[in-house]
Amino acid sequence: MSDPPDYSLALKYGITDRASGIARATEARVRMTDLAARVFGDKQELDVPRMTLMSLLTRAQAFHDGTLNAARSDNPFASFTLLRSYAENAAILIWVSEKQGEIRRLYPGAPVEQKFSIGKLLAYAENGSGGFAGIYSQLSGFAHPSAATALSGWRATDEHSLVSWKSTPQFKTEGDFMLACVWLIELADANAQLWALTWTKYFGPNSEWDAPSWPETGLSR
């Protein structure tokens, strides 16, 4: 997505090539699940509030694993589109970690009018963490037909003034591949920290908030 590629951010995470990018991103996945396991503890009661928040962790792991598999397959479209969904999951966690009771809007049977607006979530995330909207916009460039993908499949060759085309997807540059790994690491760490914070606020030993009950008035099983 950058031309010429900028490797400085990748180097910050110890990424120097594709193999190290995949390795660092895999380590980030382990950190995410390890943190969740520590926060979760050995035994938990199961109810809809807990199950709802646990499902957000499942979504995070799904997007992480899917992005890793897509990157290994040299598929930038699937990689960046899944990263976009991963970012949306982080945006929801930012919202529910800071707004008491809003987790109820994700409960089964929640009214349609309570559905989250992605635009509103992104604006809120941008206010708290500058740069979120810019990254999301870049990811959206691959999720939708746009100028960012206008020359998909085309690549410069080692021979002077020659290009090649393949119908199968491929990352345009090594920098793009490593950038996908960087974002994967950052989103894994963000989702992990936000999920742990939200869980602790609702269900930790020194919980600050009471989880909204289910079903509430207006919700149906």
Range-by-range predicted roles:
Residues 1-82, 88, 92-93, 101-221:
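A cross-kingdom marker of C-terminal helix-rich interaction/assembly modules
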